[in-house]
Curated annotation (Swiss-Prot):
Domain of life per record: Bacteria
Keyword Ribosomal protein assigned: yes
Comp. bias intervals (Basic residues): 10-30
Gene (name only): rpmI
Stretches the record annotates as Disordered: 1-30
Family indicated by similarity: Belongs to the bacterial ribosomal protein bL35 family.
Biological processes, Gene Ontology terms: translation
Keyword field: Ribonucleoprotein, Ribosomal protein
InterPro entries on file: Ribosomal_bL35, Ribosomal_bL35-like, Ribosomal_bL35_CS, Ribosomal_bL35_sf
Species of provenance: Pseudoalteromonas atlantica (strain T6c / ATCC BAA-1087)
Gene Ontology MF terms in the entry: structural constituent of ribosome
Record protein name field: Large ribosomal subunit protein bL35
GO cellular component, one term: cytosolic large ribosomal subunit
Gene3D superfamilies: 4.10.410.60
């Protein structure tokens, strides 16, 4: 049986935590930042955890993580 392929886009976006969940960077912080408030940008700086319902989908895209 051939090896399973890792979804490269997902591999660049998600990291697995010790508890088995996936974390990623928040979106909306790359460009067009002048109209966004300092508070909004500050809250977007942190990492976010993927929703529990999406964990199985991400796990399927990242079989060796």
């Amino acid at each position: 049986m051939p090896k399973m392929k890792t979804n490269r886009g997902a591999a660049k976006r998600f990291r697995k935590t010790a508890s088995g969940r996936f974390k990623s960077k928040q979106s909306h912080l790359r460009h067009i930042l002048t109209k966004k408030s300092s508070k909004r940008k500050r809250h977007l700086r942190g990492k976010k955890l993927a929703h529990v319902a999406d964990t199985a989908l991400i796990q399927r895209m990242l079989p060796y993580v």
